[in-house]
Amino acid sequence: MKAKRIVFKVGTSSLTNADGSLSRAKVKEITRQLALLHEAGHELILVSSGAIAAGFSSLGFKKRPTKVADKQASAAVGQGLLLEEYTTNLLLKQIISAQILLTQDDFADKRRYKNAHQALSVLLNRGAIPIINENDTVAIEELKVGDNDTLSAQVAAMVQADLLVLLTDVDGLYTANPSTNPDARRLEKIEKISSELIDMAGGAGTSNGTGGMLTKIKAATLATMSGVPVYICSSLKSDALLEAAEESKDGSLFLAQEKGLKTQKQWLAFYAKSQGEIYVDQGAADALRNNGKSLLVSGLVSVLGSFAYQDTVTVYEDGSGAILGKGRVRFGKSSLKDMLKSNKPKGVVIHRDDWISLTPELNDLFAEF
């Protein structure tokens, strides 16, 4: 099998006992399979939940806490204990692991994004296995990624992985809930993530974690748009990681877009915060939507918000109000207003290289980014 750069995401339900505590046996089994893949030449990243599960009992909690402060304290204790389990097991196989804790700001801030990418690249090139989790102890709501499905997709896109594997307690995406509907059918291959597919995914996860199938669809959307295929499978089957690396037929495979978004386009689509709104006429909307053109001053109808040079704005079609996309402007709001007063306004407001087209469905799906 060809060596791949693979990002594995392991959820809380795949790491815990029935009482919600960390299962050392499950961690050991995961590291055994990681070691075999590492020895086969694969570059591996593990995005692992489980910090709260590993730490809450040490603080005297009888069960997994629900209050934010209690969960953050449990994560602070558990993160070290969880990493110790991974590190000890991997060292027995002469494999170095590294801990990286991230927040949403590490993706939204271009400088920090670059630093994280460089650190991961060095670790992979040196044969280490980075073990990543969200920094639950310090992350405030505005900086939270929210779930490790999304975090793993962000990491996979960042490092341009060959495959993202989401390990869970179900063996893929079904047409209905397989536990309640005997006619539910597993989808083995998904070529396009449609709005119907998103609706079908619904919500609902397990009590020990935060992610349901809908978060996995969101993660798959982000990754496949960035050129990374996604495989959802069950961690409960033996050799689940080994089989997932070969994309066996025991899960659901989401095919990557042929032309995945480059780093700049990823940042615009998923992380750049919009500072204003621009409304354009139908001609400009058609040029942006269908012809791959830049946005010219002559196509502007109105500008709203407070934005400066190089800020990101959202562009809509005037009249219909339909979202067209986001881009980085070459003029601030005041300059654009002055230019619009001219009889023949000229200039490029957003160059095509600084533009990403968005559908309403995609905009809604990633609204919290």
UniProtKB/Swiss-Prot annotation:
The lineage's top-level taxon is Bacteria
**Ranges where the PUA domain occurs:** 275-355
Instruction: List the InterPro entries hit by this protein, alphabetically.
Output: AceGlu_kinase-like_sf (IPR036393), Asp/Glu/Uridylate_kinase (IPR001048), G5K_ProB (IPR041739), Glu/AcGlu_kinase (IPR001057), Glu_5kinase (IPR011529), Glu_5kinase/COase_Synthase (IPR005715), Glutamate_5-kinase_CS (IPR019797), PUA (IPR002478)
Pathway, per UniProt?
A: Amino-acid biosynthesis; L-proline biosynthesis; L-glutamate 5-semialdehyde from L-glutamate: step 1/2
Subcellular location, in the record's words?
Cytoplasm
Database matches in SMART domains = PUA (SM00359)
Q: Which residues bind substrate?
A: 49, 136, 148
Main localization (coarse):
cytoplasm
The molecular function terms of the Gene Ontology recorded here are: ATP binding; glutamate 5-kinase activity; RNA binding
A single GO CC term for this protein reads: cytosol
Describe the reaction catalysed, as an equation.
Answer: L-glutamate + ATP = L-glutamyl 5-phosphate + ADP
Pfam families for this protein: AA_kinase, PUA
Q: What class of enzyme is it?
A: transferase
A GO biological process held by the record:
L-proline biosynthetic process
Annotated residues that bind ATP are located at 9, 168-169, 210-216
Keywords, alphabetical: Amino-acid biosynthesis, ATP-binding, Cytoplasm, Kinase, Nucleotide-binding, Proline biosynthesis, Transferase
Matching PANTHER family:
GLUTAMATE 5-KINASE, ISOPENTENYL PHOSPHATE KINASE
Q: Which family does it belong to?
A: Belongs to the glutamate 5-kinase family.
Describe the function of this protein: Catalyzes the transfer of a phosphate group to glutamate to form L-glutamate 5-phosphate.
Q: Which HAMAP family does this chain map to?
A: ProB
The protein, known as: Glutamate 5-kinase
> Where does this protein come from, organism-wise?
Streptococcus sanguinis (strain SK36)
**Highest lineage ranks of the organism?**
Bacteria, Bacillati, Bacillota, Bacilli, Lactobacillales
Q: Which gene holds the coding sequence for this protein?
A: proB
